[in-house]
Amino acid sequence: MDKSESTSAGRNRRRRPRRGSRSASSSADANFRVLSQQLSRLNKTLAAGRPTINHPTFVGSERCRPGYTFTSITLKPPKIDRGSYYGKRLLLPDSVTEYDKKLVSRIQIRVNPLPKFDSTVWVTVRKVLASSDLSVAAISAMFADGASPVLVYQYAASGVQANNKLLYDLSAMRADIGDMRKYAILVYSKDDALETDELVLHVDIEHQRIPTSGVLPV
């Protein structure tokens, strides 16, 4: 081998990447793939819990159960004195109650504070007798008997408490739209007086689909 061939061979050897560099590159690629997979799984998990245009308040569900839709009611409790109570029956629009035999599968309450809210409230849904006047004494007894789950909502510096929803499954009870007048939303203002501009309750009633008019209103 002459000198030029020896020099060329030396150059070729020098051009080869070092084994350590190749290993570091492969390791970085593998780490990137693992991170990408983790981010993909995280995005899927978060997407499953996001509201959607089809079902904006049943968080965690992209759509109603097959054959079902939902009707929303918004309640703003009036001023409630400290240690006192408020109750409101579930009154659906006439266009819905017309189909009173359609089954109801779920009721969800979502508690949203308004800017002035800095209190603690207890919220629940209860089936009440038609004769009940939802007096303070009657509501107090229903909160005390432990027969229904209660959402304790407190002031959160971030604006909205993470667990601000209650979901009731009525499918096993075969409840229907006509039964909804027998249910009431109950609120207990535990520590402070609740002002009229402090709290909003969004109530979603998931029920079997009802016929809709094919003619636009004029």
Swiss-Prot record:
Subcellular location field: Virion
Pfam families reported in the protein's UniProt record: Cucumo_coat (PF00760)
Keywords, ordered alphabetically: Acetylation, Capsid protein, Ribonucleoprotein, RNA-binding, T=3 icosahedral capsid protein, Viral nucleoprotein, Virion
Bridged cysteine pairs (disulfide): none
GO CC annotation terms, alphabetical: ribonucleoprotein complex; T=3 icosahedral viral capsid; viral nucleocapsid
Signal peptide start-end: none
PTM sites of type N-acetylmethionine: 1
Main location: virion
InterPro entries, alphabetized: Cucumovirus_coat, Cucumovirus_coat_Asu_sf
GO molecular function, one term: structural molecule activity
Region ranges (Disordered): 1-30
Ranges of compositional bias, category Basic residues: 11-21
Biased composition (Low complexity): 1-10
Summary of the function given for this chain in its UniProt record: Capsid protein. Probably binds RNA and plays a role in packaging.
Record-stated family: Belongs to the cucumovirus capsid protein family.
Free-text domain note: The N-terminal arginine-rich stretch does not seem to be the major RNA-binding region that allows formation of an infectious ribonucleoprotein complex.
Name of the featured protein: Capsid protein
Native species: Cucumber mosaic virus (strain P6)
